[in-house]
From Swiss-Prot:
InterPro entries: Cyclin, Cyclin-like_dom, Cyclin-like_sf, Cyclin_A/B-like, Cyclin_C-dom, Cyclin_N. SMART domains: CYCLIN (SM00385), Cyclin_C (SM01332). One of its GO terms (cellular component) is nucleus. GO terms for biological process: cell division; mitotic cell cycle phase transition; regulation of G2/M transition of mitotic cell cycle; stomatal complex development. This is Cyclin-A2-4. Pfam families: Cyclin_C, Cyclin_N. GO terms for molecular function: cyclin-dependent protein serine/threonine kinase regulator activity. Keywords: Cell cycle, Cell division, Cyclin. It comes from Arabidopsis thaliana. The gene is CYCA2-4. PANTHER family: CYCLINS. The keyword Cell division applies. Belongs to the cyclin family. Cyclin AB subfamily. The keyword Electron transport does not apply.
Amino acid sequence: MGKENAVSGNSIPIHGRPVTRALASALRASSKLITSSEVAATTQNQGRVLRAKSKRTALDEKKANAPKKRAVLKDITNVTCENSYTSCFSVAVENIKQIKKGRQSSSSSKVASSSATSQVTDAKVEVVSNSAGASLSVFTDTSLGTNETSYSIIAKPSSRSPPRPFGTVERSCGGASSPKFVDIDSDDKDPLLCSLYAPDIYYNLRVAELKRRPFPDFMEKTQRDVTETMRGILVDWLVEVSEEYTLVPDTLYLTVYLIDWFLHGNYVERQRLQLLGITCMLIASKYEEIHAPRIEEFCFITDNTYTRDQVLEMESQVLKHFSFQIYTPTSKTFLRRFLRAAQVSFPNQSLEMEFLANYLTELTLMDYPFLKFLPSIIAASAVFLAKWTLNQSSHPWNPTLEHYTTYKASDLKASVHALQDLQLNTKGCSLNSIRMKYRQDKFKSVAVFSSGELPDKLFIS
């Protein structure tokens, strides 16, 4: 009894239970008496094993409950070209992110240039950032043997000051000699304008427009059966379709972008070009419209040339090519913002200028060479030319437009001249859907307006 009491007095839990008298007797009978240190070591090791197992079990349960990852199918046609073009803008995006996070040194009083140049095949992007928080992205396309250059100046939005009455004049910079501009975001009464977040929203849109832009020479490099003329005929027909079904303008702009981006990376036969057009309009309608037209309606407008199954199959191919990320800022996206900035120079809202700017911007959808310009540049150029068309007695550009577009007049010279050629139809284009549309009285018949000669002094900053 004394020995048993001695053992039981130093009882140590084994496998989660204490060493009782009965257990001690059983261990002694089987000659498997263990010491306290051995039991402690055994218990510690078992505890580690149990903890490891419990972690692994929890991890397995977590994995079991998590949804399974599915491989995204992607069309790999011309994937080298796509990856090259994506990497072409990677430098711009990274520099913009650094600007937004405020990584530049605030002690620098001069322009601190952190420039990065990335050259892929025939294209080059150069990003120059300065201490004021502005970023200039320069896209040079030398593939066509020209020195065409697109500029994208992205200014970091400053923190919003307390609300002021609409029309309050601010200074764009801290210097006394800086030009003044009107704060169009000071009107906080209309919640749809998102005045508080508008600078950040359009800053992000300016970053997004640099991504997934089709090369302006994909017709020559990717397509062998589809031509520039066929693309123009398709867009001209889609303008009529959008009018027939009273679709919003954003649907048309997004449709044309989807067509160009798909043609940029995939070879398409001419017999399937119209199928691609109605499919892209179907996808854009689902994204932009409240009540999108049904597939059968799109088949009907092609005189039942294509079946429902063919449209669904093409829709699947397009969505896979885009990895289901179909949205991009278009010229219409920026035109709304720039028109609001342009209207402050008028005592009353000018509907003629609004319709004329929309007309000029839509004309660029049919013109394949305009792919070399950024959407924001096209929108700014449309406002510039619209103001010049309506009033040639004053300069069409002012500090307010320069502030909100981030473009100087000198940056728009090439695009404005190209847009004026479209307006005057110097090439004698026979596609008239957009011109007939804007000759209607509801659009103030702005298609009949013509602009005078553009003197070089307009583009001197």
